[in-house]
Curated annotation (Swiss-Prot):
The gene is aroA. It comes from Bartonella tribocorum (strain CIP 105476 / IBS 506). Keywords: Amino-acid biosynthesis, Aromatic amino acid biosynthesis, Cytoplasm, Transferase. Disulfide bonds: none annotated. Catalyzes the transfer of the enolpyruvyl moiety of phosphoenolpyruvate (PEP) to the 5-hydroxyl of shikimate-3-phosphate (S3P) to produce enolpyruvyl shikimate-3-phosphate and inorganic phosphate. GO terms for cellular component: cytoplasm. It catalyses: 3-phosphoshikimate + phosphoenolpyruvate = 5-O-(1-carboxyvinyl)-3-phosphoshikimate + phosphate. HAMAP family: EPSP_synth. Monomer. This is 3-phosphoshikimate 1-carboxyvinyltransferase.
Length: 442
């Protein structure tokens, strides 16, 4: 077993420079999956080459897709929709919850046996939210108690199209069902009460699937997918990941005399809840050179040091920033006054109990906060004085690691995290980028 590698962040000043962050993780997973299903070749520029994404690539290769890297882009020769091969061994997703859940949806309706395994963290995460609709489609499942990994899917001879009301705001559940609908006769319908990230819908249309989207009288979103479409390979340019950019944005806002530009960041409306919240707190964040790339809105972000004030973040905003609450908690700790985050129970079933991990880390670093089942209240002091000095347990969670390294760049006293290795699952360049901008991490 590999040994943990602690690392410490120290109070920094004057972060400056331009950086271009790696591709969006959500779009990277989906590009590999749809490229692997399509006829012909798909060319992917800007793929996030993190451990999570590469595990999805390995899974698609195990089921017949040809995936190679050439120079700075990736080429996928897909199997054709409906033509995946049975994997000869279990698909190991490591820490990749998104990859595992989306591939479960994609492969569920295939009349074959597929086994999914993962690391200790992924094996604790709930899979029932994906397995329940697959069961309705006729998939038989052998799972560890409580619908956890390891698990095996036995696809039916002919899957049933379903009309499924997603019980929680989850782009992963929605996407898994839509991917299952690709190899299912008839019309598969997903009903989501609130908009979640919509990359799957956009990309399915781009690859040639027929989707119809409407609203019902209650305002819920109905997505109808017509089964057995002919998917054709595409050229994809993946914009930078706003969830990774979040920690750099927070660092630049809080470290004195900072002025940085993050180029080519995805600003899809379903992904900018954090930026909207930071604007309400008084943040100086500009969108420069706004443009569209592959149907997605993209901009360069200029961020300057700002004095922030506490706000209340409504629960309705949670789906558009669910991965960014750890970053927001850092901003809240140094803001003036109370910040209240509501409707965030989904944080409890991430790579760790992320809500608890954030609250513990804040308290260890002398920040007053209150943790509830579905909320977090942070009492900001408006100053770095007296804060920091903690040794933080990351719980094998990449976002907790980046959260408290960012905290340590601002606090009066250094902050040490117990292990930096898991940062590579989503943002391998994080520490080098912080150093490049002038941050002190060692």
């Amino acid at each position: 077993m590999q040994k943990a590698i602690p690392i410490t962040a120290y109070k920094s000043s004057s972060l400056s420079g331009k950086i271009r962050i790696p591709g969006d993780k959500s779009i990277s997973h989906r590009s590999l999956i749809l490229g692997g299903l399509a006829n012909g070749e798909t060319y992917i520029h800007g793929l996030l080459e993190s451990a999570d994404v590469l595990n999805t690539a390995s899974a698609m290769q195990a089921m017949g897709a040809c995936i190679i890297k050439k120079d700075d882009f990736w080429i996928i020769r897909g199997t054709g929709n409906g033509c995946l091969l049975a994997a000869q061994k279990p698909l190991d997703f490591g820490n990749a919850g998104t990859g595992a859940r989306l591939v479960m949806g994609m492969v569920g309706p295939y009349h074959m046996k597929t086994t999914f395994i993962g690391d200790a963290s992924l094996s604790k995460r709930p899979m029932g939210r994906i397995l329940d609709p697959l069961r309705l489609m006729g998939v038989e499942i052998e799972a560890t108690h409580g619908d956890h990994l390891p698990l095996t899917l036995y696809g039916p001879k002919m899957a049933n199209p379903i009309r499924y009301h997603v019980p929680i705001a989850s782009s992963q559940v929605k996407s898994a069902i839509l991917l299952a609908g690709l190899n299912t006769a008839g019309i598969t319908t997903v009903i989501e009460p609130v908009l979640t990230r919509d990359h799957t819908e956009k990309m399915l249309k781009a690859f040639g699937a027929t989707l119809e989207i409407e609203r019902d009288k209650e305002g819920a979103r109905l997505i109808h997918l017509y089964g057995h479409p002919h998917l054709t390979g595409q050229t994809i340019h993946i914009p930078g990941d706003p969830s990774s950019a979040a920690f750099l944005i927070i660092a630049a806002l809080l470290v004195e005399d900072s002025d940085i530009t993050i180029e080519n960041v995805l600003i899809n409306n379903s992904r900018i809840g954090l930026i909207e919240t930071l604007w309400e707190m008084g943040a100086h964040i500009e969108f420069l050179n706004q443009r569209q790339t592959g149907g997605e809105d993209v901009a360069d972000l200029r961020i300057k040091s700002s004095v922030l004030k506490g706000v209340t973040v409504p629960k309705e905003r949670a789906p558009s920033m669910i991965d960014e609450y750890p970053a927001l908690a850092v901003a809240a700790a140094f803001a003036e006054g109370k910040t209240v985050m509501l409707g965030i129970e989904e944080l409890r079933v991430k790579e760790s109990d992320r809500l608890s991990a954030v609250a513990q880390g804040l308290k260890i670093n002398c920040v007053d906060c209150e943790e509830g089942q579905d909320f977090l209240v942070v009492y900001g002091k408006g100053s770095a004085k007296g804060l920091g000095g903690g040794y933080v347990s990351t719980h094998l969670d990449h976002r907790i690691a980046m959260c408290f390294l960012t905290f340590g760049l601002v606090s009066e006293k250094p902050v040490t995290i117990d292990d930096q290795r898991m940062i590579a699952t989503s943002f391998p360049e994080f520490i080098p980028f912080i150093k490049q901008l002038g941050g002190k991490i060692a």
